[in-house]
Amino acid sequence: TNNYIWRGLTQSISEAAVQGGIDYADDSGFYIGTWASNVSYDSDDVYSYEHDIYFGYAGEAGDISYDIGYLYYNYDSNAGFDFGELYGTVGVGNFSATLSLLVNAEPDEGPGQDFGFAEASYTSLDYVIPLESGAEIGLHAGFHEGDFMYAFNGATDDYWDLNISIAKDGFSAMVTTTTLGDDDDGDGVEDYASMGARDNDEIKFVVGYSMDFEL
């Protein structure tokens, strides 16, 4: 991808990222996997890559699909930013809703940043529109609430991210933006928009290609 976007925020200072993962899913619904990507938050930062580990259980009950699991985010060069989340997704037809809750975070995020269970959350709403050509249009709205993202990623406490995407045969294109609110000091948008060429208050165009292999 030309830009690693996570919850509306660039994780690669709007530069290219190479990503990959391995998943195992059992017929019972249990799954486990790992995923990695290069990351960068400033031209002289200490980050090199993100390595995630996750596991969960997914299934269906009539017309309703569900998925619940745990995701641990590990950042190679600075263990102080490692954290974990519990997530749950419910889907009906082409619509799905996901809630992610902060479960654990390293205690050295910064002064006053010892975060406890569910002190930050992310809610996402997604809708997929299949086209006759085989392509799919995706509509997404997400909302982050809590102080953790300010400590971890410099973002203001609460914000929305919105995007529209189209995907076919592994190719994808997306237009995304965020609506960053003010932090407690009232200067969050200006400070964060200028940090490390992130420009997360601007509209971003993202393209990518992915492929799957079965072992």
PLM regions: where:
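Short glycine/proline- and aromatic-enriched beta-strand/turn motifs that initiate or cap beta-hairpins
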Residues: 1-40
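Outer-membrane beta-barrel "beta-signal"
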Residues: 93, 164-172, 177, 197-215
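Residues on the lipid-exposed face of transmembrane beta-strands in outer-membrane beta-barrel proteins
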Residues: 20-26, 53-59, 70, 86-92, ...
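Sequence/structural signature of outer-membrane beta-barrel proteins
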Residues: 2-8, 35-44, 62, 71-79, ...
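Residues that define the transmembrane beta-barrel architecture of outer-membrane proteins
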Residues: 14-18, 47-51, 64, 80-86, ...
